[in-house]
Design a protein with these regions (language model features):
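Arg/Lys-rich, alpha-helical DNA-contact motif
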Residues: 1-26, 45, 51, 59-108
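Short coil turns linking two alpha-helices in DNA-binding domains
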Residues: 31-34
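Conserved active-site tyrosine of GNAT-family acetyltransferases
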Residues: 38, 57
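Glycine-centered, phosphate/nucleic-acid-interacting loop/turn motifs that mediate DNA/RNA or nucleotide
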Residues: 42
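Conserved catalytic core of two-component sensor histidine kinases, primarily the HATPase_c ATP-binding
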Residues: 54
Length: 108
């Protein structure tokens, strides 16, 4: 029997997760106005390409918003919070790349 929480831990599922700006605001507690401001500053990016269309966000950007909110709640400025979040993302991407390379080397 499959665990009912599996979809929430499944990277394929999370990559397909797309949420509108109103739902993101409800889920995260971040006001819509603030989300728009962060996007206007280039800190986050919606999947919406056309002007005037509802903004929609993927899991990565929602997670980014939550991390930014955490740093802001800890007293950091928005710019510093954005830098800290990007540093963490870069660290995880580099670590994941190294693990993939090590795995490929070990299977040869």
């Amino acid at each position: 029997m499959k665990n009912s929480t599996e979809p929430f831990l499944d990277p394929v599922f999370l990559c397909k997760l797309i949420v509108g700006i109103g739902e993101v605001a409800q889920i995260t507690g971040i006001p819509i106005r603030q989300i728009r401001y962060w996007e206007d500053k280039g800190i986050i990016k919606s999947l919406t390409e056309e002007e005037g269309k509802n903004r929609r966000y993927d899991y990565v950007n929602i997670k980014k918003m939550l991390m930014i909110k955490l740093f802001l709640d800890e007293g950091f400025t928005l710019d510093t919070a954005a830098v800290k979040v990007q540093e963490r993302i870069t660290f995880f991407e580099e670590t994941f790349q190294k693990l993939q390379e090590a795995s490929a080397t070990n299977t040869d």
